[in-house]
Amino acid sequence: MTAASLDPTAFSLDAASLAARLDAVFDQALRERRLVGAVAIVARHGEILYRRAQGLADREAGRPMREDTLFRLASVTKPIVALAVLRLVARGELALDAPVTRWLPEFRPRLADGSEPLVTIHHLLTHTSGLGYWLLEGAGSVYDRLGISDGIDLRDFDLDENLRRLASAPLSFAPGSGWQYSLALDVLGAVVERATGQPLAAAVDALVAQPLGMRDCGFVSAEPERFAVPYHDGQPEPVRMRDGIEVPLPEGHGAAVRFAPSRVFEPGAYPSGGAGMYGSADDVLRALEAIRANPGFLPETLADAARRDQAGVGAETRGPGWGFGYLSAVLDDPAAAGTPQHAGTLQWGGVYGHSWFVDRALGLSVLLLTNTAYEGMSGPLTIALRDAVYAR
């Protein structure tokens, strides 16, 4: 399915027909045991057309998924923390072109030749700094030897120590000369803490969660009974996760992820700005709607810049046709991407089994939070859900 036949001025969504299509998609995924449970929301121009919980939050206990179930957000954290950064930019407390050393004077990563390049807030927001991720490199890599955390696993050191280790790894390229998914939002989390004088959780709450009415999100929770139990893909059915499990990523996505489901309940776990938040589907939708509509949340010029491709289509951040802005991947060429979404669509996901997109041309915000990695992030379910939304 491509975008060629979808005229934004003629596009319409009937809630009953949409629900029938989406329910069929979830019924098939559950029947085939590719999915344990999910919460999905589709909104158009701020009106919720579909919001349903599917399957089980805890398969072994038989606990059903609820619309207010809490999820470990993984990289769905990133756009929320990026919004906090942009709010500080709007206030003049941060600057996009300023070096990160203005707030983190000790963070001075070098290139392979030993030279120290300028790394800016812009580079970090767009993942063009040259930093990387253990999950991309895997066992035996420099990131592995240095013991750098991705913010998904549980370590016995703090954020400052992780950034010290990260700064000692050579950059993959000169800042601004390439694109690579990275720990940049963890670095920006530390920048937010220094700029505000607050812990990251408090700063994100004040800058983003409270203004948007996100009441069920944070970094450390004391309500384990509200959480979806995480699972990973397996045969004949998904496998319940345990701390320390290493799950290979799908081909083309990287090496593997080291999960620690208990991290979200550990008060001593450092706040990962790239992967450490939890939240409900309603909370995440509020953030997506702020990104889509920007109801005075950011100055319009800054919101436009955040939603515009800053990395270039050559970055292929989700494959051909995709660039990257300050919040997520940005669709430049729907035909090259082979998608019915429109140019300017923003999209990303999370390794615990999440995906979302915002098609601003159609006023669409579409969210899928699941407890099944990686089916809910990049599996057939995500394509089937997308195509069901655009089906005519």
Swiss-Prot record:
<keyword id="KW-0963">Cytoplasm</keyword>
<comment type="similarity">
    <text>Belongs to the class-A beta-lactamase family.</text>
</comment>
<protein>
    <recommendedName>
        <fullName>Esterase EstB</fullName>
        <ecNumber>3.1.1.-</ecNumber>
    </recommendedName>
</protein>
<dbReference type="InterPro" id="IPR001466">
    <property type="entry name" value="Beta-lactam-related"/>
</dbReference>
<dbReference type="GO" id="GO:0016787">
    <property type="term" value="F:hydrolase activity"/>
</dbReference>
<dbReference type="InterPro" id="IPR050789">
    <property type="entry name" value="Diverse_Enzym_Activities"/>
</dbReference>
<dbReference type="GO" id="GO:0005737">
    <property type="term" value="C:cytoplasm"/>
</dbReference>
<dbReference type="Pfam" id="PF00144">
    <property type="entry name" value="Beta-lactamase"/>
</dbReference>
<feature type="active site" description="Acyl-ester intermediate">
    <location>
        <position position="75"/>
    </location>
</feature>
<keyword id="KW-0378">Hydrolase</keyword>
<dbReference type="InterPro" id="IPR023650">
    <property type="entry name" value="Beta-lactam_class-A_AS"/>
</dbReference>
<dbReference type="InterPro" id="IPR012338">
    <property type="entry name" value="Beta-lactam/transpept-like"/>
</dbReference>
<comment type="function">
    <text>Acts on short-chain (C4-C6) fatty acid esters and triglycerides, including tertiary alcohol esters. Activity on p-nitrophenyl esters is generally higher than on o-nitrophenyl esters. Lacks beta-lactamase activity; it hydrolyzes the ester bond of cephalosporin substrates but there is no opening of the beta-lactam ring observed.</text>
</comment>
